[in-house]
A protein has these predicted regions:
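Conserved PLP-binding active-site segment in aminotransferase class I/II-type PLP enzymes
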Residues: 1-18, 29-32
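PLP-dependent class I/II
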Residues: 2-3, 28-34, 40-54, 86-88, ...
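A glycine-/small-polar-enriched, mobile loop at the entrance of the PLP active site in fold-type I
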Residues: 35-40, 54-72
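Conserved N-terminal alpha-helix of the aminotransferase class I/II PLP-enzyme fold
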Residues: 63-96
Length: 390
């Protein structure tokens, strides 16, 4: 029996995933709804992390703290071992989360009114963060090729030429789970360099390589253009630690670092909570065996979902290269998004994410989180099937 086969009760724990569905979906009562929507896992974090946090809690004093040298070194070691990426400790800046890091990058490295480029369908904060900070969002959608979303570099260059100042890259891609290859990444860098555009690379899903694919950090292949890149990463998605709220930016350019440090201080994010250093260090030094067991478990869940759901006429399932999020294509059914979401909630008692949350390019798709026990996945599949059995 796998450690991931256990089902842990999460209702009534102030879990966004389990306890906020009434608010998110506009329901009076969601007690019978199975949540397979937001991207956190239903698995316990590595035992080493829990033990380290418990030991820290037993100290009983929770004063101001800072990121330990051991924790910083664990980041360097993790990136070297996991991604063959060699970074300097001095390049690391800490933040309360990757979304907060994205916001700090926008505020520190662009000016109000500047244009920020994104490539939808993509993670919703890519739309919201620049706009809420007074920047203009320019969209250059990915295009479909052989059932996958890819870059249209002719359109991408045309967009960059519109006086764009920053590009936000999702690497690996969310929601599609694509692992961008070296040629794609190098072309992104080349074109951004041509138009003097900085690149903010969200790489929070980097460790979640499902079927043996290799994550390529953008900065690793950027060559002489490395200083135009800020890489945003965290252990939180990898080890199910979102509530700990710790992330880091890797910034090789000293001028950008100083600007980001100033914004960190100005926004009151100069220090992390006292558990952040402990959790990060334990995860990166002792969490690898847990992760290595997790990835094939998620892969098996994905294979099961694809096999079962594609028995429904008009449903196509894309298994991602990365993440634990499945992208479901229902466009052949000719159903409106509102209708299929209502059916899923009312008939299937199942909460998934609508594709348009990731931009209009996501219309006709659903996102399903399969980072849960196989029994829960089977339950979710049966609920999905029930919707189309009537």
């Amino acid at each position: 029996m796998s450690i991931f086969d256990q089902t842990i009760k999460r209702r009534c724990t102030n879990s966004v995933k389990w306890d906020a569905m009434e608010k998110v979906y506009g329901l009076n009562d969601a007690s019978d709804i199975l949540p397979m929507w937001v991207a956190d896992m239903d698995f316990p974090a590595p035992i080493a992390v829990s033990k380290a946090l418990q030991q820290h809690a037993e100290h009983t004093i929770f004063g101001y703290s800072y990121m330990s040298e051991e924790a910083i070194q664990s980041i360097v070691d993790w990136q070297s071992t996991r991604h063959d990426w060699h970074i300097e400790k001095e390049a690391i800046l800490f933040c309360n989360g990757v979304v907060a890091a994205l916001a700090n990058c926008i505020v520190a490295l662009t000016n109000p009114g500047d244009k920020v480029l994104i490539s939808p369908p993509v993670y919703p904060p890519f739309f919201n963060i620049p706009k809420s900070n007074g920047r203009e969002v320019v969209s250059c959608p990915l295009i479909e090729k052989d059932g996958l979303f890819v870059y249209d570099f002719e359109a991408f260059e045309q967009s960059l030429a519109q006086d764009v100042k920053a590009y936000i890259l999702c690497n690996p891609h969310n929601p599609g789970g694509y692992v961008w290859d070296e040629a794609t990444l190098k072309e992104i860098v080349r074109l951004c360099a041509k138009y003097d555009v900085i690149i903010i690379s969200d790489e929070i899903h980097a460790d979640l390589m499902i079927n043996g694919d290799k994550h390529i950090p953008l900065a690793k292949v950027a060559g002489d253009e490395i200083n135009r890149i800020v890489t945003c990463m965290a252990p939180t998605k990898t080890f199910n630690l979102a509530g700990i709220q710790v992330s880091y930016m890797i910034v090789t350019d000293k001028k950008k670092r100083l600007k980001l440090e100033a914004i960190n201080m100005a926004s009151g994010q100069g220090s992390l909570n006292t558990f952040a250093s402990v959790a990060l260090h334990a995860a990166y030094t002792e969490g690898a065996p847990w992760l290595d067991e997790l990835l094939p478990y998620i892969s098996a869940n994905m294979d099961y979902v694809k096999t079962e759901l594609e028995q429904i006429p008009g449903i196509r399932v894309t298994i991602p290269q990365s993440t634990y999020l499945i992208w479901i294509d229902y466009r052949e059914l000719a159903l409106e998004e509102k209708e299929i979401m209502n059916r899923l909630l009312e008939i299937g008692k199942l909460a998934l994410e609508p594709g348009t949350k990731y931009g209009e390019e996501g219309r006709g798709f659903l996102r399903m989180n399969v980072a849960c026990s196989f029994d829960t996945v089977k339950d979710g599949v049966e609920r999905f099937k029930k919707v189309f059995a009537q």
